[in-house]
């Protein structure tokens, strides 16, 4: 066993009667003994399916309390879990399988029903924490003779997560048992977590935020966990009060919704004496200062901003609870952070450049990446721009890359463009992020039509409809703009920053 699986196993076996994870949709707490039953049942399933060390299981499920036990069962055997969005269209799910040949998929009833390939065997699985469909590639599994049952090592991968690249092809981040345990330990220590804490998880379980920052750090601290299907502004404060939630990790969009939602404000007014939040952690993109102050004043709860990413298995910097600096991403914690200017790494105050990170929780390469330009001399180059102030606090000032950040989701423009290119009336296009008060950025499709000035309303609606049916919800354009030509450089490349400024300057509307 690895240090990670030993810790997780001991936690369940040493506290059998303790309630440790609650599923909000089921309105039920699960004891450590019940979770251990699920771990055993899933582990037996994986073994019966001829899975072993190094195999990858694709998981496409809604948020629930089953995720921690799927992980633990798989990690005990050296199996790697790759969670993806449950809103992934069936075409996307099959494309993933065609590329990576997963021997087993755990998914929803709807996606299993749409999966009609005869080579796959489908069966229902019920455990304490969830019901799901199991799709097995019988052609791969039935005649296996080379299953690896050797001892799992700390350097073995346990989790694969997708992170968007500028090419539009998602990059796969492989996180080892060692990396995840280190990251979760840093998270727990920096946020002073104890077994008296209860974390509420609203972020999707195919994100590093939910997987490591919230779930795994809580288990490292022997804290309790409340898993919700998704964020609900109107139910937020009731959930916090009823379940004695002490902290939650969010994106700035959630902070905005809580401030704006009348039901949320009314609920807080009724329940204020029952709310015991120590802090709310906010990351993904900067929270406007006036919104941060408004939240802290209205809800009497500290907001801690930090900076992290999938490649770091969680956070790299965080504001100290006793000395937060509004507008900053805080101080490095468990991470070396430098600013790259030309070929020189520096931490000099005021030096603006690309943020580079290094640490025992940071990956050293992407999976299947033949050109590791993001890695240099042991540093991971984030593609984000920033600087340190005179006190060593990091300020993130934008992205060197073109990735769109929408409510915490990362959207690759090239991927959206490749899908929309199927529409015959698009002559040229560029997908960019435009400022949005709630989501940080909105996915905006800018195009030159084959019929300029004609049928724009119909074409706009067709793009929005086509996007909703062919892309994940967070990738779908919510805004469409028409232009006669794009700003370009001397080689013909579209100048996206100039295009963005052009739309802002003319006050373009949806």
Regions found by a protein language model. Give the residues of each.
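Gly/Ser/Thr-rich phosphate-binding loop
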Residues: 245-250, 259, 263-325, 336-338
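Conserved AMP-binding A3 loop
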Residues: 29-33, 158-182
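Conserved AMP-binding/adenylate-forming core of the ANL superfamily
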Residues: 20-50, 55-64, 68-72, 89-94, ...
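Conserved pre-ATP/AMP-binding loop-to-beta segment of ANL
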Residues: 16-17, 143-162, 169, 192-198
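Conserved AMP-binding/adenylation subdomain of ANL enzymes
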Residues: 181-198, 208-247, 261-262, 267
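AMP-binding/adenylate-forming catalytic domain of the ANL superfamily
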Residues: 471-493
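AMP-binding/adenylate-forming catalytic core of the ANL superfamily
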Residues: 88, 359, 364-365, 385-474, ...
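Conserved ATP/PPi-binding loop(s) of AMP-dependent carboxylate-activating enzymes
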Residues: 324, 331-334, 344-375, 409-411
